[in-house]
């Protein structure tokens, strides 16, 4: 009976294990950290919710250290490299656009000259192949006789020479085949065609077509700018070389020496170093503060877990004391019930003795055999 009473627990009470409590605390901590997610294009979370930097490809221990990682030297160098590559790509695209614009003007002039020549040539072209070859020879001799110009349009006669040479080769092949079949008739036809071609050219072509002074080609607008840029670059390189050639301390005045050598003055250099030192110290302080904050957070969690363990132990002791109290109460109840039963039995026995005594006393003692 005592064992059954000790096995019973009070109704409506739930006993929490230490492992379950630890699991609940870790889950609560995970939920609190998940709410503070870093919103940054370089922040990346994996399936387990661990934070890492996508640019540096390095894991970050917690969200508290993200700002420290961003202010770090490695992350800033990666960001600077990314910005430099982006600016270089933009600069190359911007430099290629003006170059294509500058090349449009000579191409348009070339097309205009080609169209003018194409309109003039079909007007004087006869039906015979011999006349075309002679006219090509005359045009070729004229082009060779004209002096070449250094402008961009001086390339046009060379292009026309190639076309005329191809036409001349085709005409020579036709002429050779014609000479093999009809030598005499072709010779007479050639003389007649040459004379007729000269008459046609003299009648159709203008008077100043074969002038000795051809029109000057327009000057390309960007040629002078390129030369000026080259001269400016040479001057800058010479100046830089002369400044670098001077040794340190060439001038007595340190400020003049620094200005000529194109370096920072000693005072400015000291201020710059002091600013860099302060910046580095601030970064170190922020890192140390973040580390201290993380350690404090871990210590606080450890203290909370320790306090919870102590509370669990106290609850266990209270439960033990309550169980012991229940056991003692049950024992007392059993003892009291036993005593009450004993009293009842004694009372019953006393009442039986008294009844017998009364019976004896009520009988007549003088009667024979009354006490038997």
UniProtKB/Swiss-Prot annotation:
List, as start-end ranges, the regions of compositional bias called Low complexity: 87-99, 194-204
Sorted UniProt keywords: Acetylation, Cell cycle, Cell division, Chromosome, Coiled coil, Developmental protein, Metal-binding, Mitosis, mRNA processing, mRNA splicing, Nucleus, Phosphoprotein, Spliceosome, Zinc, Zinc-finger
Q: Where is the composition biased (Basic and acidic residues)?
A: 104-115
User: InterPro entries under this entry?
Assistant: Matrin/U1-like-C_Znf_C2H2, ZNF830-like, Znf_C2H2_sf, Znf_C2H2_type
* Cellular compartments annotated: Nucleus; Chromosome; Nucleus speckle
**Source species, domain of life:** Eukaryota
Coiled coil regions in record: 312-349
Q: What is this protein called?
A: Zinc finger protein 830
